[in-house]
């Protein structure tokens, strides 16, 4: 019998692959995503699909925006995927393929396709995946899949995802066609967008703190290098 990998195993592998320290504000993001991906990877009902991959890539790219040094972002993403014994290039390629499809489709056609009321010949693999999801009573719905759906809609029509009514209607149609809970879709995406806002606010606060600290250091440096006036002859 094969031993199921634990979260500790995955974390150990990750930190062996990416050995440089991760900035504090981003470490929680990386570890939460790592745990989420790990738990799905060991779930018997979970199977990889390109919409999930798009959700992983979107989540990572959005929450890691502004990470310094920028060159470490690729190393962190690669380690994240390899820690759960997955190929990072596979995730990236599937995500890019789906983004390109969504950009080339009117959003109504995309919603119909995702909701399985319209059949398009744009991508046979995605069509097969959508049908497999809709026909699988044990499909393991997850937050990253929801983010993948949201990312597709956003790529097709950025304005639609800003309109709560239109977004809710789109998610309802997609959920009905794929036989997943539209309530879960909406709640997961509300939390996702809320967390993005919180992350953006935290980055602003951090930037302000760094700027203030830099100014203080510059002031101290100027004071330490300022010439000391000699005592006057009257003293």
Curated annotation (Swiss-Prot):
One of its GO terms (cellular component) is plasma membrane-derived thylakoid photosystem II. Belongs to the THF1 family. The keyword Amino-acid biosynthesis does not apply. This is Protein Thf1. It comes from Nostoc punctiforme (strain ATCC 29133 / PCC 73102). Residues 222-235 have a biased composition (Polar residues). Residues 213-235 are annotated as: Disordered. Keywords: Coiled coil. May be involved in photosynthetic membrane biogenesis. Residues 183-204 form a coiled coil. GO terms for biological process: photosystem II assembly. Pfam families: ThylakoidFormat. The gene is thf1.
